[in-house]
Amino acid sequence: TRRSSDLGYAPCLNLYDTQKAIGLLKRLFEDTLGGALHLRRVSAPLFVEASTGLNDDLNGVERAVSFDIPDAGRDAQVVHSLAKWKRMALYRYQFSVGEGLYTDMNAIRRDEELDNLHSVYVDQWDWEKIIAPRDRNADYLRQTVRTIVSAMAETQHTLRSVFPQLTALPPLGTEVSF
């Protein structure tokens, strides 16, 4: 197996502080963006029944990690995408227009090409929101992007105050060009 140092990555924090920083980052970003976009947390599945079709194959070539559940007489797949599942969850949780969900997906993508940003194991934060037909336009999309960038910058600012070692990285700006 390759280590991060083999891939040209040099961490700013030790291993334990990296875990603490990741946990804090997740909590801060969830709270900040969740409040700004009216999102609520929903737990994501670790696996889905293969027959449901909810495990989106992203670009058509991913092979799911599959296993049988003998007592249930069913086959399951470890998730590698929540695209379809999120839309079903919006319906099942009875979200309304202007509301949405965020979730933290833990997945296995067996066919992933590995590098500094990609791993076979995926811990991915994701969100989905119901918008009105009148909001399906470029202005609404641009405002949503500005909100996301602002939440990212606010999260980074707080994270850097807790972990000063991260100040070696450039701060995120809040200006967005389209």
Locate the predicted segments by residue.
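Short, small-residue-biased leader/transition segments that mark boundaries at the very start
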Residues: 1-4
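Long, well-ordered alpha-helical scaffolding segments within enzyme catalytic domains
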Residues: 138-157
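Broad gene-expression machinery/nucleic-acid interaction feature
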Residues: 62-64, 73-75, 101-103, 122-126
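Short, flexible loop/turn elements at secondary-structure junctions
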Residues: 48-50, 82, 106-109, 131-133
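A generic structural motif
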Residues: 13-17, 126-137
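Conserved alpha/beta core surface patches that mediate binding of polyanionic ligands
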Residues: 83-123
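N-terminal "assembly arms/tails" that initiate or stabilize quaternary assembly
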Residues: 11-90
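Alpha-helical scaffold segments that mediate packing/assembly in large oligomeric complexes
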Residues: 153-178
